[in-house]
C-alpha cells in the first residue's frame, strides 16, 4: 500500500494537505495556549519554586499516578484509562504523520514489536475509557450532570473514539504482529480495502486537528495547564493561609513594619500566577460542588463556578489585561459577595479536586480586601470583630472571666508547665463547652501530666478573624499570644478546638511559633490510653458515631485517634473521616446568620441521625454546638458529647461505683 502522504489528491500531494492541516490546527492551538499563558503570568509573584524533591514526588503520584482522580472509582477509572492510553499513544501521532515519508527508521528492529504493542495497548485503553464514559453519560447520567449541556464532553469522546478506531484500521495494513498487536492483526483479517484505510487515515488526522482546535476553547485546556498546576500546587501545611507580607527571614512582617499598598485581592492581577493557572485547569468534573456545604444548602456559592468566573473574566477582559490596564469590574463583582461570604473554609473542594485547584484562597483573599480596604463586609461580623479587638474573644466577655470554669480545679494558671492547655474561646465562655474543658483538664491531671492553662493571659488564636479576612486583627492576636508563650517558655500546647489546633500548630510558625508542638486533645488522650495511664472506654451497650471536624480530619489528618479514645464507633456516618461533611461553623460562619431554607448543620445532623446511634461524639466546640442545634431541628434525641466527656464520665462513674461499694462494706 502506498502511504496516504505519498498519494496525490487533485492538485495537492498528501503531505501538503497534512502540512496545511497541521499548520492551521497547531498554529491556532499554540496561539490560544500562549494567550492563556500570558494571562497567567501577569499575576502577582508566588514562591512555588521550593522543595523540588517533594514536588517531583507529588507530581508523579498526583499527575502520572492520578491519585486524586481515582478517589471517584467509576469516573476515575474511565479517566485513567484515557489518560494513560493517550500517554502511550501520543508518540504514535508523529509516527502516523511521517511513516513511509522519511526513509530512515526511528526505532531499532528489536524494539519495534514491543513499541507497537505498547501503542496498541494505549489505543485500547483510551477506547475502553471513552466508550465507558459515553455510556455512563447517556444511560447512567450522574446527578451532577443532569440538566447540563453535555455537548462539549460528548464531542470530545466522539473524537477520541474516532482517533482510536481509525488507528486500528491504519495498523491493519502494516502487517501487525499477532502477538504484539492482536487487535490490529484482527482488523487485518477483515481484509479492509486500501481506500477504506486511506479514508481512515485522513479521518484520524482530521479528528486530531479538530481536537487541537477544541482543547484551548474548552475545559480540555487542562490537558496543557494541569501539568504546571499539579507540579506547583501548595505542598505546605494543608489550608495554611499566607501572611500579608513575608520578610527575608521567611517570617511574617511585623505589623509596625508593614508597607502594603493594597490588602487582599480586588483586581485580577492581584491573584498570584499559581492561583490563575487554576482557572485553565478546571475539568468541570463537579466534584468540588458535590462536597461543598454552602452549595448543598442552596447558597450562592459553587466552588466550580468560582474557578470558571476567574477564567471567564480573563477571557472577556483579555485586551485590557494584556495591555496593562485594570478593568472596571472587580473580582468581587464577578464572583459575587454572596459566594465569597458563604464559604465555611472546610477545604473539601480543595481536597477532592483531582487537579489540585485551590478554591478557598481565592475567596479568603477577596474577604481580606473587603474587610481591610473597601469595608464592604456583612454587618453581622462587626460584633465579633469588635469583641476580638477589645476583649480578645468573639463573645465579648472580660479577660478576667477566662478561667472561671476552672475555679474549683487544682490547675496551674499562668504558670510554666510542660503542657499548656489552650482552652479556646468557646470552651472558656460557652457553658456547654466548659464541660469539655473540665473533662479534658481532669483527664490530663488524672494521667499525671504537668499541665496548666494561661487564664486571662490567653487570647483568641485568631482563626475567626483570619478566616473572615481581618488579617490585621489576626496578626495582632497572634503576636500577643506569641509574646505570652515566650514569656512562659511554652513549648507544648494541647488544644481541644481544631481551629486553634490548626492555627497555633500550622500558622503561628510565620510569627515565631515554628518550634511549638501543638496537639489536639484526642491525640494526647489516645496516647495516654496506649501507655496505660488512662482507661479504655467501655460502652456498656451505648452506641456511638463520630463526627469528624473539618479542621481535625480532612485538614489536620487526625482521624483514628478520636475513635481510639472512645473505643471505636459502632456506625460510621454516610460521610466520615477525610470525606466528612462540614457542620457549618467554620470560615467565621459561627458569627454570621445563615440565610437559606436548608441549613448546613441540619444536613449533617440528618446524616448523623441516620446512623441510629445513641450518641454523636465530637472533637470540636463549634461542631458540638452546631450538631446539637441541627439534631434538635431535625427532631433527633441523640446526645452530643466530646470524646473527653465520654472518657471522663466513665472514670467518674467507676469512681462512684467504687465509693458506693466501699460505703456498703463500711
Annotate each predicted stretch with a short phrase.
Residues 2-132, 139, 270-279, 301-307, ...:
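Iron-sulfur-cluster electron-transfer modules
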Residues 21-28, 127, 161-162, 195-231:
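Alpha-helical membrane-embedded segments
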Residues 29-47, 99-102, 132-150, 169-180, ...:
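Juxtamembrane/interface segments at transmembrane-helix termini
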Residues 40-63, 144-154, 181-187, 224-255, ...:
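Juxtamembrane inter-helical linkers in multi-pass membrane proteins
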Residues 48-49, 71-76, 108-118, 142-162, ...:
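Membrane-interface segments at loop-to-transmembrane junctions
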Residues 80-90, 155-175:
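Hydrophobic alpha-helical membrane-insertion segments
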Residues 187-197, 240-248, 254-255, 260-263, ...:
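Iron-sulfur cluster-binding electron-transfer modules in prokaryotic oxidoreductases
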Amino acid at each position: 500500500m502506498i502511504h496516504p502522504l505519498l498519494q496525490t489528491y487533485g492538485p495537492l500531494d498528501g503531505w501538503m494537505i497534512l502540512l496545511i492541516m497541521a499548520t492551521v490546527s497547531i498554529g491556532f492551538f499554540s496561539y490560544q495556549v500562549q494567550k492563556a499563558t500570558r494571562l497567567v503570568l501577569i499575576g502577582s509573584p508566588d514562591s512555588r519554586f521550593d522543595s523540588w524533591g517533594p514536588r517531583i514526588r507529588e507530581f508523579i503520584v498526583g499527575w502520572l499516578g492520578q491519585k486524586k482522580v481515582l478517589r471517584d472509582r467509576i469516573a476515575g477509572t474511565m479517566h485513567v484509562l484515557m489518560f494513560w492510553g493517550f500517554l502511550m499513544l501520543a508518540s504514535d501521532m508523529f509516527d502516523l504523520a511521517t511513516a513511509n515519508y522519511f526513509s530512515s527508521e526511528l526505532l531499532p528492529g528489536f524494539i519495534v514489536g514491543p513499541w507497537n504493542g505498547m501503542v496498541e495497548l494505549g489505543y485500547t485503553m483510551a477506547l475502553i475509557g471513552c466508550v465507558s464514559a459515553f455510556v455512563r453519560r447517556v444511560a447512567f447520567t450522574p446527578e451532577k450532570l443532569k440538566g447540563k449541556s453535555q455537548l462539549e464532553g460528548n464531542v470530545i469522546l466522539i473524537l477520541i473514539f474516532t482517533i482510536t478506531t481509525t488507528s486500528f484500521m491504519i495498523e491493519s495494513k502494516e502487517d501487525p504482529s499477532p502477538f504484539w498487536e492482536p487487535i490490529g492483526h484482527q482488523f487485518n483479517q477483515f481484509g479492509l480495502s486500501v481506500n477504506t484505510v486511506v479514508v481512515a487515515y485522513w479521518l484520524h488526522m482530521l479528528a486530531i486537528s479538530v481536537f487541537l482546535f477544541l482543547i484551548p476553547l474548552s475545559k480540555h485546556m487542562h490537558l496543557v495547564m494541569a501539568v504546571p498546576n499539579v507540579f506547583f500546587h501548595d505542598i505546605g501545611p494543608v489550608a495554611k493561609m499566607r501572611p500579608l507580607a513575608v520578610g527575608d527571614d521567611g517570617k511574617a512582617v511585623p505589623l509596625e513594619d508593614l508597607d502594603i499598598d493594597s490588602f487582599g485581592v480586588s483586581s485580577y492581577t492581584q491573584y498570584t500566577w499559581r492561583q490563575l493557572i487554576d482557572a485553565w485547569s478546571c475539568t468541570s468534573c463537579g466534584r468540588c460542588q458535590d462536597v461543598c456545604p454552602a452549595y448543598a444548602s442552596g447558597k450562592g456559592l459553587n466552588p466550580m463556578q468560582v474557578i470558571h468566573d476567574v477564567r471567564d473574566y480573563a477571557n472577556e477582559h483579555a485586551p485590557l489585561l494584556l495591555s496593562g490596564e485594570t478593568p472596571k469590574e472587580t473580582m468581587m463583582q464577578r464572583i459575587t459577595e454572596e459566594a465569597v461570604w458563604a464559604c465555611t473554609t472546610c477545604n473539601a473542594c480543595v481536597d477532592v479536586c483531582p487537579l489540585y485547584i485551590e478554591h478557598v484562597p481565592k475567596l479568603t483573599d477577596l474577604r481580606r480586601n473587603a474587610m481591610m480596604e473597601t469595608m464592604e463586609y456583612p454587618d453581622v461580623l462587626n460584633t465579633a470583630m469588635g469583641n476580638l479587638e477589645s476583649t480578645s474573644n468573639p463573645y465579648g466577655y472580660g479577660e478576667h472571666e477566662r478561667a472561671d470554669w476552672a475555679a474549683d480545679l487544682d490547675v496551674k494558671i499562668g504558670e510554666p508547665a510542660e503542657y499548656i492547655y489552650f482552652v479556646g474561646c468557646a470552651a472558656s465562655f460557652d457553658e456547654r463547652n466548659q464541660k469539655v474543658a473540665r473533662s479534658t483538664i481532669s483527664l490530663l491531671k488524672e494521667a499525671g501530666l504537668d499541665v496548666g492553662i494561661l487564664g486571662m493571659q490567653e487570647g483568641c488564636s485568631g482563626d475567626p478573624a483570619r478566616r473572615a479576612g481581618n488579617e490585621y486583627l489576626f496578626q495582632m492576636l497572634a503576636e500577643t499570644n506569641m509574646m505570652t508563650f515566650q514569656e512562659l517558655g511554652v513549648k507544648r500546647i494541647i488544644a481541644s478546638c481544631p481551629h486553634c489546633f490548626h492555627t497555633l500548630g500550622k500558622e503561628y510558625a510565620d510569627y515565631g511559633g515554628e518550634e511549638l508542638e501543638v496537639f489536639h486533645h484526642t491525640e494526647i488522650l489516645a496516647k495516654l490510653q496506649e501507655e496505660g495511664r488512662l482507661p479504655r472506654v467501655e460502652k456498656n451497650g451505648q452506641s456511638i458515631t463520630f463526627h469528624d471536624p473539618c479542621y481535625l480530619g480532612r485538614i489536620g489528618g487526625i482521624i483514628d485517634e478520636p475513635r481510639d479514645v472512645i473505643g471505636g464507633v459502632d456506625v460510621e456516618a454516610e460521610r466520615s473521616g477525610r470525606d466528612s461533611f462540614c457542620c457549618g461553623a467554620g470560615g467565621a460562619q459561627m458569627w454570621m446568620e445563615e440565610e437559606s431554607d436548608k441549613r448546613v448543620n441540619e444536613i449533617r445532623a440528618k446524616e448523623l441521625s441516620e446512623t441510629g446511634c445513641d450518641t454523636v461524639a465530637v472533637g470540636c466546640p463549634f461542631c458540638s454546638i452546631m450538631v446539637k442545634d441541627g439534631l434538635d431541628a431535625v427532631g433527633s434525641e441523640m446526645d452530643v458529647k466530646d470524646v473527653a466527656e465520654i472518657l471522663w464520665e466513665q472514670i467518674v462513674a467507676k469512681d462512684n461505683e467504687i465509693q458506693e461499694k466501699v460505703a456498703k462494706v463500711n
